[in-house]
Amino acid sequence: MEVQPIQIISTYPTREEAVLVGGEAVQLHMAACAQVTSEITSIYRWEGKIRSGREFQLKLKTLSTMETQLIAWLTERHPYKVAEILVIPLSYVAPDYLSWMKEVIH
């Protein structure tokens, strides 16, 4: 199967946690790039009640060959009991960017 670019998204309760996890993923060559958003407000149902809270979204640019490993790594380190971990296939990535991703991820 051909290697495909993907984005993995997760949310964290603090910016510091999201930056730390993103930095480690890049340092460990599991992601080419990590981006942490500004504060977002999440609204969700938990334990029968509607709740809301501030979170920070971590976006990891990686390859399909790292998907299983990166999901397991994120799940193991995540502070939430039920972690939001989403995988989004990227239908287009600029050729030069994709080549760079393939160079730095292993």
Predicted regions mapped to residue ranges:
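Positively charged, small/polar-rich N-terminal and surface patches that mediate targeting and assembly
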Residues: M1-H106
